[in-house]
């Protein structure tokens, strides 16, 4: 048995509500993007993988998740996506547009914070086990298996920190 909690008789509405609020794996809210970071990075909506026109749009979203909601400048994002190779301004605008339009098509406009040329992820508007760990809702050893966004090199620093924390 893998119970998240239990209720002792007499059963009351309050006891049921309390246990539902403290589920190990909470019930996903409708219209909430689900982001998986442990292992490969993947984005799901209603249980299905989200398709982006450009693979770099998915990488852009992955980096924003890795930054944990911090606003990132276009210059920083281009340096990560193109590894300091200049001359990708127009391509970056297409990638950014693809990300925003894909999220809009899923009615997930509130996932990205946009402020004066900076982008960040709105942590409260997505479901992500990494964010649950950061917020203290789950223990690292319950969600981390030694891999974090394995397809992206920028994730190596975070992965090494998670590995160190999990080894303690």
Regions found by a protein language model. Name each.
Residues 8-168:
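Intrinsically disordered, low-complexity protein-interaction/activation regions
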């Amino acid at each position: 048995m893998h119970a998240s909690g239990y209720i002792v008789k007499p059963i009351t509405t309050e006891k049921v509500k309390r246990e539902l609020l403290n589920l190990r794996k909470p019930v996903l809210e409708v219209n909430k993007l689900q982001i998986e970071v442990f292992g490969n990075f993947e984005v799901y909506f209603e249980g299905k993988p989200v398709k982006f026109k450009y693979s770099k749009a998915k990488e852009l979203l992955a980096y924003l998740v890795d930054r944990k909601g911090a606003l990132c400048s276009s210059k920083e994002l281009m340096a990560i996506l193109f590894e300091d190779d200049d001359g990708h301004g127009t391509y970056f605008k297409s990638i950014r547009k693809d990300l925003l339009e894909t999220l809009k098509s899923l009615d997930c406009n509130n996932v990205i914070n946009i402020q004066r040329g900076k982008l960040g992820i709105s942590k409260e508007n997505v479901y992500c086990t990494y964010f649950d760990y950061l917020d203290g809702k789950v223990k690292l050893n319950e969600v981390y298996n030694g891999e974090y966004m394995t397809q992206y090199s920028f994730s190596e620093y975070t992965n090494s920190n998670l590995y160190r924390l999990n080894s303690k």
